[in-house]
Amino acid sequence: MSLSPYLAFAKKSFLQKSAYRLDHWLGILNTLIRLVIYVEIYRVLYGGRTSVDGITMSMVITNFILSLGLESFFVVDDYYLSSRLYNGSIATEMLLPVSFHGRMLSDNLGTALFKLIFHFVPTMTVALIFFGIEAPASVPSFLLFLLSAILGYGVLWSMSFLFQMFSFWLLNVWAIMTLKNVFINVLSGSMIPLWFMPEIIRKIIGFTPFDSIYFTPVQIYLGNISGSELALGFVKQLIWISVLLIFGFMLWNKGKKKLVVQGG
């Protein structure tokens, strides 16, 4: 299978995003405002203390900066399929000699690359200047963090892929996408560091894919997990990517059989 068409789709998506400069700057501003709010809330909660239950304020700030940084370019289009079902273009796209899912991924990766260069980098630069973050535990930890971040994006994308398949049976998937994103925000550790969750809640979250998106990469960066626990974190990410994709393709195959195009 030639990668050329998918590279072209990714390039097109990259260039399309570059046309919306105001949206780009507002996105950076939004991320920085959220970061300031989160940090100030926890500074108040810490009440001048440097550590609470072994969790330092520096660790909390690092968690927020890295999580929001990753979130800024972890781009998925939750409505890619539903929009094409609604306007009828799905019928034409499925006839093209390229994988529909490959095109979906390519479009998202093109946007993610744009966000990485023009959103993540400047946001992280400003955050480092005004807040500072802990250095990675070691060079290997930083490299493993990058690998885990890639797998974290894989979990996020696969989850979106699965939920998008419900578009075949629902006229509007906004409600379930909103619910999914609420769970991601709360349970991934980006909004509330999972260190502060009750142990029973952390164990329950551990059986879900949510902490594999942001929290696992951050834990690796900080050197909080190593050895068998580190290996388990990677295995868990790979398992969730596989499980979500398997169920996603099962729904895709069922949905194609009863495809009803809304619109023209």
What are these regions (language model features)?
Residues 1-264:
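Hydrophobic transmembrane alpha-helices and immediately adjacent juxtamembrane helices
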